[in-house]
Amino acid sequence: MKKEEMLVAAIRNGIVIDHIPPTKLFKVATLLQLDDLDKRITIGNNLRSRSHGSKGVIKIEDKTFEEEELNRIALIAPNVRLNIIRDYEVVEKRQVEVPHEIVGLVRCPNPKCITNNEPMQTRFRVIDAEQCTLRCDYCERKLAGDRIELL
């Protein structure tokens, strides 16, 4: 798509979170606590995508993300792309990926799991990154996709 045809305005410096599934867009926005951010934010949903049919996009001026924030995005929408923008140009493109191990980000759904009864961090292994299937290191309960509850 040419720049003059863009539905969502370009930003000078910042980050573009692209290829968000439309059903996950507002969950990603909530997760990143965008309502508390005092930066210029542009959100577009159900935009045309050649590869996915439709997509969501979030553009945030003058913002970078910590690795933990990226891990959280990957748990909700594992195939999101991040574009780093400087002076209106994309200087870096990055695919967000689910990490091999997730510590302190996800709640175990097993009420008998020690992490729900003792003051300790949860720890999960990713057993299928594409389906985002996790297994608790302590009780071995498996959970996937929309059943993942972030802390």
Curated annotation (Swiss-Prot):
Record keywords, A-Z: Metal-binding, Pyrimidine biosynthesis, Zinc
Q: Does the keyword DNA repair apply?
A: no
A molecular function (GO) held by this record is: metal ion binding
- Please give the function described in this protein's UniProt entry: Involved in allosteric regulation of aspartate carbamoyltransferase.
Locate the transmembrane regions by residue number. Answer: none
Give the multimer and partner information: Contains catalytic and regulatory chains.
The record lists the organism as: Porphyromonas gingivalis (strain ATCC BAA-308 / W83)
Q: Which Pfam families does the protein's record reference?
A: PyrI, PyrI_C
What do the Gene Ontology cellular component annotations say?
Answer: aspartate carbamoyltransferase complex
Q: Where does Zn(2+) bind?
A: 108, 113, 136, 139
The entry assigns this protein to a family as follows: Belongs to the PyrI family.
Cofactor: how and how many bound? Binds 1 zinc ion per subunit.
Instruction: Identify which cofactors the protein needs according to its UniProt entry.
Output: Zn(2+)
Lineage summary:
Bacteria, Pseudomonadati, Bacteroidota, Bacteroidia, Bacteroidales
Query: Could you provide one GO biological process annotation from this protein's UniProt record?
Result: pyrimidine nucleotide biosynthetic process
Please give the name of this protein: Aspartate carbamoyltransferase regulatory chain
